Amino acid sequence: MLRLCFFISFMCLVKSDTDETCPSFTRLSFHSAVVGTGLSVRLMLYTQRDQTCAQIINSTALGSLNVTKKTTFIIHGFRPTGSPPVWIEELVQSLISVQEMNVVVVDWNRGATTVIYPHASSKTRQVASILKEFIDQMLVKGASLDNIYMIGVSLGAHIAGFVGESYEGKLGRVTGLDPAGPLFNGRPPEERLDPSDALFVDVIHSDTDALGYKEALGHIDFYPNGGLDQPGCPKTIFGGIKYFKCDHQMSVYLYLASLQNNCSITAYPCDSYRDYRNGKCVSCGAGQIVPCPRVGYYADSWKEYLWDRDPPMTKAFFDTAETKPYCMYHYFVDIVSWNKSVRRGFITIKLRGEDGNITESKIDHEPSAFEKYHQVSLLARFNRDLDKVAEISLLFSTGSVVGPKYKLRVLQMKLRSLAHPDRPHLCRYDLVLMENVETSFQPILCSQQQM
């Protein structure tokens, strides 16, 4: 809540621009945020035919909305400056590009624009009521609830939940993008988004220590980088306004990345981020019957696997790169050592492709105990995917700055891709790693018995 207060104080004046040919998202000024705004909801329809020019619709005039097709509602959250969300147009275009559908932008900027956050949050039920009135008319015209999809950002996630609750959870899907935490944390299910609000509820939590909601709210809850500080976002207040909103907005950009086919972000079901980082959560993907869940638009492809769980809910964790498309590529590094004594330490791995590109991963795990003839499997994350690896470099460190330097005697090292399980496993045998000294070698294909 403290960061929210600072966030509001950093807002600056936004000019109004109303001279437009096509209806556009309501643009208000910071003055409007200071004096407050009454609630007014506009529904803006985009279709395959009208991708850039919205049509204003309402419960008495559905316009060119095709009730036989999927309808996706985009619901924004708190707007302390009055400006439109910077991501709204890109999200509309990206959704229409992947599937022919109706996209309805729920513009409640008059109501969400205020410097007093509780005033905005108090209007969420009213917005949900207006949306229900509109959907009721869609149903009269022949639409089906399971063909309705709601994407809610921040406060918008709870609005989507309230709409779903009014239909007893029969909506097809609700996606919550960093659902708002302040004034909702600790509230009972009927006062926030929860799994009973739709047939499938997926959530991305990207700012759980400030503006977002920490606990699980859906059938599957994704926690990028543990749901806390996001790579590429400022770490101190000296980053300006971006410090306050970057982590919160990252949920939207990760969702957008899933629509743009640059890469497929996968996550790993797990009890905690710590267990995920330590490589304990790979019950999906390479070598497994169940694929790993995909983050974003295609998350619902995993719902059939959730039905086998009791309850049908899970948390999933993943890491991201600092820049678009945010994908990290996961590998397992399996090491069998033959030291007489146990060696505890960390491994850094660097890969060089045949094209000369290099990518490095500090395998960020707790100190591993390398015991004689015992295999240790380490999860490594790279921000570049190398199709053909020409050279591998390993560095062993105990993390100690004083005392003797140790050796790690490696009987076998195996590198295997989780993202591409069909790729051949790469091995190296009989290797000695001197502490804090990088050792490079050309890998060979593992023998068939070790695949």
From Swiss-Prot:
Q: Name the family.
A: Belongs to the AB hydrolase superfamily. Lipase family.
List the active site. Answer: S154 (nucleophile), D178 (charge relay system), H248 (charge relay system)
- What's one GO-annotated cellular component? extracellular region
For the protein in the UniProt heading, the enzyme class is: hydrolase
* Entry's Gene Ontology molecular function annotations: carboxylic ester hydrolase activity; heparin binding; phospholipase activity
Question: What is the name attached to this protein's record?
Answer: Lipase member H
Q: Name the domain of life.
A: Eukaryota
Set out the biological process GO terms recorded for this chain's protein.
Answer: lipid catabolic process
Q: Please report the organism this UniProt entry assigns to the protein.
A: Mus musculus
